[in-house]
UniProtKB/Swiss-Prot annotation:
Subcellular location(s) of the protein: Plastid, Chloroplast thylakoid membrane
GO CC term (a single one): photosystem II reaction center
Protein name in UniProt: Cytochrome b559 subunit beta
Residues in coiled coil: none
Subunit note: Heterodimer of an alpha subunit and a beta subunit. PSII is composed of 1 copy each of membrane proteins PsbA, PsbB, PsbC, PsbD, PsbE, PsbF, PsbH, PsbI, PsbJ, PsbK, PsbL, PsbM, PsbT, PsbX, PsbY, PsbZ, Psb30/Ycf12, at least 3 peripheral proteins of the oxygen-evolving complex and a large number of cofactors. It forms dimeric complexes.
The entry's keywords: Chloroplast, Electron transport, Heme, Iron, Membrane, Metal-binding, Photosynthesis, Photosystem II, Plastid, Thylakoid, Transmembrane, Transmembrane helix, Transport
Membrane topology, as annotated: Single-pass membrane protein
Length: 41
């Protein structure tokens, strides 16, 4: 399991970074759009 961890670590890190890189801005834009709609009203 330790041998595979060294091989899986970089792939898992890149995948984790890509998911957060897409998820964080998405949540931020959704929050900004929701806030703008409430401000207009």
């Amino acid at each position: 399991m330790t041998a595979r961890k060294s091989y899986t670590y970089p792939i898992f890190t890149v995948r984790w970074l890509a998911v957060h890189a897409l998820a964080v801005p998405t949540v931020f834009f959704l929050g900004a759009i929701t806030a703008m709609q409430f401000i207009q009203r």
